[in-house]
């Protein structure tokens, strides 16, 4: 073994972290010894860090600090990081049933420019989640009584409004989601309920009847609680922005997470950007059996922005997170100013995309009409520079006279193939798989039990600015179990709805979609809702009627601007 004379760590070494003072002892802060160890490993290769069984605590006081613009999160700010994995090669972090417990505002894992990174055998949770819970004691249209455990979820009532702790501050309740007592899933026909005039929401007067019992009264004539609310249901009380994902992976190659469980994160459980070849195997976002909260991650289970190579999600369980299980997309930047036929300034429009890199010299861009969502020019980047986190200046190698303000660009260098198989997606807020990748996509042998569209294929150049016209998606041998029971989150179990405002001749934004050999358990007629796609094959599927929920109006196949639709051998 080669040995680094500066650190004394041999290439290929296995390090039991307890030998470095990282110990599974009650409340002991392991952040500083972990930081020192990771700093020693910079420039090293083929290292394994071994975490023996036990609970390891991490606090933000001695953590590494970085300014991060994390895609699809709510703030661009200095983040404290526990596992700062920077430019590592062939690093393995191996847990032997190790539990990592994080405290306060701390980002557990940040990997930047790593190659061949493997993480396994860990569970992750926070000592105090960033959301709270309540149980409905009684409810009518104007008054609701809530039971809140003040030890588990401390609260204050200030000027008649409910507040919860956020670090050293107290944040007001700004929305909640009601969960069915029996199913531990969102209530049928519910929606997010917002609070406060700043959110255009309800403005109840809150009063504590006794410790742990709070009454909310709506005094404005026009305001009502939802008719679907009932005693015994639990409320997820949201009073924190999505700030810290559990795993944030940026500009890496060959990332493999196996046998990892995330019980909570104050953002997404896993997000990767500009990363090639990712495998998530038996990666779980699930309820902690020792602390049975009704929610897990505060946002998506997994999210992939401008990734490449192959993305594999296998044998995973994603449940009870507060947004979609999987979202795969690129980013559209809107043309702000055309500075000639070969130069332009573009804007990152959505607040959660600020600061994201749109490309490098030599990579190819596509220019798209935001009305039809169709591309009309491709060119390599001659030069590119960020003017600030909002605006980017770009010079193209090939000129184009058609470019105009309001149109958008996307980077063609990041188009992953995707395989999602043998997974369970259930009981979360919102939808299932959001798939906008021009690579080859295979979705098979999965179980979907989600309140919105189980599979959503979009592409949007006018609101979220998430790019990715599909070319070839196959959805086969899956079970769709009574999905799309919340109207706000989808029109049908499988939905294709790019933001194109009009068609253009025989061209369509999306390419081919094959839906075959699946089983649909449906409480109404709706199965497929599609717009602006070239070809759909719906074959050899079984559709079974259930009485799980009251039917929602809609056709079995609701299609517009679909060039070719083939239906055969379904029953």
Residue positions per predicted region:
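Acidic Gly/Asp/Thr-rich repetitive segments characteristic of extracellular carbohydrate-active
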Residues: 17-50
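Extracellular beta-strand-rich solenoid/capping regions of secreted or surface-exposed proteins
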Residues: 35-42, 57-92, 101-120, 128-144, ...
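Ser/Thr/Gly-rich low-complexity blocks that favor extended beta-strand/coil architectures
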Residues: 102, 126-127, 151-207, 354-388
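Short glycine/acidic-rich loop motifs that flank beta-strands on beta-rich extracellular proteins
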Residues: 102-108, 128-132, 244-246, 266-271, ...
């Amino acid at each position: 073994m080669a040995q680094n004379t500066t650190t004394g760590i041999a290439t290929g070494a296995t390090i039991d972290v307890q030998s470095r003072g990282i110990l599974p002892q009650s409340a002991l802060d392991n952040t500083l010894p972990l930081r020192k160890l990771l700093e020693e490993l910079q420039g090293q290769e083929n290292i394994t860090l071994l975490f023996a069984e036990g609970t390891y605590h991490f606090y933000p006081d001695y953590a590494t600090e970085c300014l991060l613009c994390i895609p699809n999160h709510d703030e661009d700010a200095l983040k404290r990081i526990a596992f700062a994995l920077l430019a590592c090669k062939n690093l393995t972090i191996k847990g032997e049933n190790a539990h990592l417990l994080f405290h306060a505002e701390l980002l557990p894992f940040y990997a930047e420019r790593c190659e061949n990174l493997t993480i396994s055998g860990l569970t992750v949770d926070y000592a105090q989640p960033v959301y709270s819970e309540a149980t409905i004691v009684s409810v009518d249209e104007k008054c609701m009584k809530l039971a809140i455990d003040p030890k588990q979820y401390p609260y204050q009532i200030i000027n008649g409004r409910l507040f919860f702790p956020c670090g050293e501050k107290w944040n007001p309740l700004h929305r909640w989601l009601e969960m069915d007592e029996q199913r531990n899933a969102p209530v049928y026909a519910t929606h997010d309920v917002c609070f406060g005039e700043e959110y255009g929401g309800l403005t109840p007067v809150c009063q504590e009847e006794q410790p742990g019992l709070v009454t909310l009264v709506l005094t404005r004539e026009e305001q009502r609680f939802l008719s679907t609310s009932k005693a015994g249901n639990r409320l997820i009380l949201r009073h924190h922005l999505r700030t810290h994902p559990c795993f944030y992976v940026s500009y890496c190659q060959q990332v493999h997470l196996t046998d990892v469980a995330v019980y909570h994160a104050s953002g997404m459980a896993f997000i990767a950007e500009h990363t090639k070849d990712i495998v998530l195997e038996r990666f779980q976002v699930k309820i902690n059996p020792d602390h049975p909260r009704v929610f897990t991650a505060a946002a998506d289970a997994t999210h992939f922005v401008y990734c490449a190579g192959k993305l594999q999600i296998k044998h995973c369980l994603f449940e009870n997170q507060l947004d979609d299980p999987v979202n795969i997309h690129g980013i559209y930047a809107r043309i702000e100013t055309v500075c000639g036929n070969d130069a332009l300034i573009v804007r990152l429009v959505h607040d959660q995309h600020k600061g994201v890199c749109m490309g490098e010299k030599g990579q190819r861009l596509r220019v798209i009409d935001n009305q039809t969502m169709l591309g009309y020019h491709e060119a390599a980047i001659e030069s590119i520079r960020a003017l600030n986190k909002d605006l980017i200046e770009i010079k193209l190698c090939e000129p184009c006279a058609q470019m105009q303000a309001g149109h958008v660009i996307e980077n063609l260098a990041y188009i992953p193939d995707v395989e999602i198989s043998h997974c369970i997606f259930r009981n979360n807020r919102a939808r299932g798989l959001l798939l906008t990748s021009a690579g080859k996509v295979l979705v098979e042998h999965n179980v979907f039990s989600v309140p919105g569209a189980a599979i959503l294929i979009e592409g949007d150049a006018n609101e979220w600015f998430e790019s990715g016209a599909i070319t070839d998606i196959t959805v086969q041998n899956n079970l769709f179990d009574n999905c799309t029971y919340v109207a706000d989150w989808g029109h049908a179990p499988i939905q294709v709805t790019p933001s194109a405002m009009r068609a253009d001749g025989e061209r369509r934004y999306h390419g081919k979609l094959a839906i075959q050999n699946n089983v649909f358990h449906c409480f109404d007629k709706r199965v497929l809702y599609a717009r602006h796609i070239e070809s759909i094959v719906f074959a050899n599927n079984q559709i079974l009627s259930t009485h799980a929920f009251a039917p929602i109006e809609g056709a079995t196949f609701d299609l517009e601007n679909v060039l070719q639709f083939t239906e055969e051998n379904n029953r």
